[in-house]
């Protein structure tokens, strides 16, 4: 302000430069604009104010010419103190340039208001010749201007700038008048020197800073008198961003210099807002980042920041303002934006429409106000929802929406544990590719209690915070139409299968593994996969399974020198018998015999064969009745996928089959889809057939015409086929060098072969003795001798030496033909292969 008056004094003393505003670089209006950089109306106000100060002999005049302008500018502080003492502006320390410009503009406005003048008055005063304006006739000129303004009516009242001592109510000026003023300003400064600061069209700096300054001015009583304006002032004071949704330049400028501009923002409009406003109103996830909120003009750079923004109070208030500006627009009737709650993150990633049931009914203007929306996320404050959102509508939803979680093992268990303490879970839905989950509670109160709790307490999944709120789009999860009665039971069917990993490859029986789980409850079913060092044990109840998992989390489970990892299988929820009659009958039949089991007792070959005929893999002949019971249910064997689809009568019911994709969610919703865990993924080919199962379909097709005697020997053929499949699996693992990989490969691949060989000797020796006369000499093999190599013909040179029986490569011929061919695994596989050839030859003769 001091610089403005100093320049006015300079212009006063240099009469030759006073009227030529565009040519003189240090003229009256140009100098004021250079120091203030304000709109045209305030520039003319400063011009008139400077002229008033000069006429009233404020003690600032000095005889300076054009060359002395620089020294006059440096002495601005002295005259500034004089001005402050006269107009009681108060002494403030030196401010930054932008703050000083803004403060000087408002001080000039207050000075003019103290004289009862407006911007239009000063415009007319500036048109008077300077030689006709003297301190003597100035009061008469001002009175004449005021009388003329009174006669013309309120058209001269320009909001804050035109406020008189009587505090006339602000008048809404047509937009055309502002355009004229803008053009006048541009025309007045077209010839201005290039060194001067550029003129900004009606941009009065940051709205938040300007609003804070207005709150300190005497304009406060106007806002207190007018309730609506007070509410609008507080509304605009919360942010420093403008609207991009308005069409005209005047409306885009945000808050103007007074209540006039505030009221202009509430101008009613017809129709609906632009699509960008609608999308941001509904909280749709942006397609990319950074994203600019078209309602708040606020840039966001991530999903988390976007979620915090749309749940904040400032965004909510602007959504309410958008509804007031477009009274005819009903956001619930938008066909492309069916999100019911404009303040919640749009669940745009949900599967096909209608999966979770119809959205709740739309809310209308006639509903009663319900007060705070404190249960829909932090930052909402005490703001009422737009158009008085009914709390009853919130209560109708029973679906808890969980977002922003990270995937991991036992994801479903982790998610359900968040809400399980608050009530019964009736259904749930976990999306496959998107980190969103919906959990339906039995009652609305349970869902509301869970949401209220996590409003104040962070919800954690795998130790990372997640967002929990009540879904406003979906009231409940719809049951599938085809199987309404097959809905899973949370307590009895979900999560009953325990997954044991890092088991030893061999050296233990099935019963030894089962004894690990027996202390925690009754075992309903199990499957053991030695080649994959893992096992699945189904307990009778979920509580038993959870008890074992919880105990092993606190205290590590050690088995034969290995730390066994125990967790609840997320992949499989139960083990199902495809032929339940045989399996169940076998279980019931062996239960009574299990009690009378003696560790020293062994079964005769005939008894063991009756239980394991058709089994793909027999684990041990020394195991007791309990082992036989389980191996009869689900003997284990690695098979090819095509064979597994035909023959096994036991499978793991995988939740991976019920994964929710966006395209298939409608059909897969029944049992509460979840994301499978890769770590406990077990191929269906790992599941073996039942103990009393008939020969496999593949074997039956190959040997359909075999005689009864040949069918008795099918067990051996199956074992040989299993051997070949193991060889293929070993070959897939890559080429192995004899020095580095021979011991490990043979031991890992054939670790349980001694048991199988013993089993074979136990259950098949009598058959071999009976049928030895039918086996030609070329297919016979004597007893095993460690230092005598056999089957050397099967070791062939191929970039090394490859054993076709064991699927192993060797670079050294001596190691391959002597060391390897003298090994027990090689001998066992050769024996099985010769038995297979002999059986095929016999079948050909009989046919």
Curated annotation (Swiss-Prot):
Query: What is this protein's gene name?
Result: MATR3
Q: Which GO terms describe its biological process?
A: activation of innate immune response; blastocyst formation; heart valve development; innate immune response; post-transcriptional regulation of gene expression; ventricular septum development
Cross-link Glycyl lysine isopeptide (Lys-Gly) (interchain with G-Cter in SUMO2): give the residues: 3, 132, 146, 245, 269, 478, 487, 491, 515, 522, 554-555, 617, 630, 719, 736, 770, 836
- RRM domain location is 398-473, 496-571
Name the consequence of residue 85 to C.
Answer: In ALS21; results in increased interaction with TARDBP
Query: Would the keyword Repeat be found if you checked this record's keyword annotation?
Result: yes
Protein's name in the database: Matrin-3
Segments spanning the bilayer are none
What lineage is this protein's organism placed in? Eukaryota, Metazoa, Chordata, Craniata, Vertebrata
Biased amino acid composition, Low complexity: 666-676
